[in-house]
Amino acid sequence: MAPLVALVLLGLLSLSGLDAVARPPKVQVYSRHPAENGKPNYLNCYVSGFHPPQIEIDLLKNGEKMNAEQSDLSFSKDWSFYLLVHTEFTPNAVDQYSCRVKHVTLDKPKIVKWDRDH
């Protein structure tokens, strides 16, 4: 009986080790359609490959948080997570847009600027 209990405990400990693999997020910022000044569009921030799942993602306009929607948290085959944050916006020649990500694997928030040409 004792060897069985030890084996079960060892198995549980090895499973708990899955949570210990911390992975930093990859961040991509892009618009749904090619950018045209004055034409409504959608701004997307796709964050992937991160673990653990606790994360904070904000879309920013000139450094200020925008109202945005977030997809449900999903995971890949490798058990890393991904999310999409998106909002409607109308690009112009002046405003700057970016995505700010806060995650336990990052020393400071990661900010990725939207490049309207890509």
Swiss-Prot record:
Stored Pfam families: C1-set (PF07654)
Family annotation (CDD domains): IgC1_beta2m
Tagged with keyword Secreted: yes
GO cellular component assignments: extracellular region; late endosome membrane; lysosomal membrane; MHC class I protein complex; MHC class II protein complex
Gene3D superfamilies membership: Immunoglobulins
Any Gene Ontology biological process: immune response
Ranges for domain Ig-like C1-type: 25-112
Disulfide bonds: C45-C99
Signal peptide, first to last residue: 1-20
Keywords tagged on the record: Disulfide bond, Immunity, Immunoglobulin domain, MHC I, Secreted, Signal
Listed GO MF terms: MHC class II protein complex binding; peptide antigen binding
Keyword Disulfide bond: yes
Broad class of the protein's primary localization: secreted
Protein's job: Component of the class I major histocompatibility complex (MHC). Involved in the presentation of peptide antigens to the immune system.
Subunit structure and binding partners: Heterodimer of an alpha chain and a beta chain. Beta-2-microglobulin is the beta-chain of major histocompatibility complex class I molecules.
Family the entry assigns: Belongs to the beta-2-microglobulin family.
Name the record gives this protein: Beta-2-microglobulin
Source organism (scientific name): Sus scrofa (Pig)
Gene: B2M
